[in-house]
């Protein structure tokens, strides 16, 4: 288990011999907080992408070379929730940009940008169904509400070659010890018997 400040060092490739954008993925338990998705994306963007030309929209800033994720199905563009790509070009005149989704270029108009987010870090929940060569998982006690064994299992199994857990060893221990899964009360049995 590594110290939490090492998450960026691992991700930017100082310790891993791989491309930090295309060959690894940071998976965070939560969106908010010091090691949440939002903060990690800001930090990682500043370290990995020093370009200055950008489109700013709301609280987001998009630059050529940024790793981004589609957050909603868009059938008109042919991109779907969870698709990850790299920004190829930015047009400052009309606020559009092009994203490469595995060798398929998609043009986003300014109104479509609300469905994009930085993807240097994504939530563990969002990563379900995806795989990456290497995953880096920051764990802190601040995530106590989310620290469940099944969450750690989900995160670790996203990595094909390696999973690196960064953070507080006590937080990891909390998660591993926590085997209580919340019982769902849906009334499904009763509804099926009525049908």
Annotate the PLM regions.
Residues 3-77, 88:
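Conserved helicase motor core of P-loop NTPases
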Residues 80:
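Conserved flavin/dinucleotide-binding core of flavoenzymes
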Residues 83-195:
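C-terminal accessory regions
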């Amino acid at each position: 288990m590594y110290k939490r400040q090492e998450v960026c060092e691992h991700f930017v490739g100082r310790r891993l011999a791989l491309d930090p954008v295309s060959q690894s993925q940071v998976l965070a338990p939560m969106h908010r907080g010091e090691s949440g998705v939002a903060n990690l994306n800001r930090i990682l963007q500043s370290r990995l992408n020093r370009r200055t030309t950008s489109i700013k929209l709301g609280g987001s800033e998009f630059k050529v070379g940024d790793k981004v994720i589609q957050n909603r199905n868009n059938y008109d563009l042919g991109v779907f929730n969870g698709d990850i790509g790299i920004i190829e070009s930015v047009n400052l005149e009309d606020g559009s940009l092009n994203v490469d989704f595995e060798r398929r270029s998609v043009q986003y108009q300014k109104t479509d940008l609300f469905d994009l987010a930085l993807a240097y870090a994504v939530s563990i929940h969002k990563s379900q169904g995806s795989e990456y060569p290497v995953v880096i998982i920051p764990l802190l006690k601040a995530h106590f509400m989310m620290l469940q064994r099944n969450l750690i299992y989900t995160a670790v199994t996203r990595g094909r070659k390696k999973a690196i857990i960064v953070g507080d060893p006590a937080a990891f221990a909390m998660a591993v010890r926590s085997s209580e899964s919340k019982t769902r009360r849906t009334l499904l049995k009763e509804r099926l018997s009525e049908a």
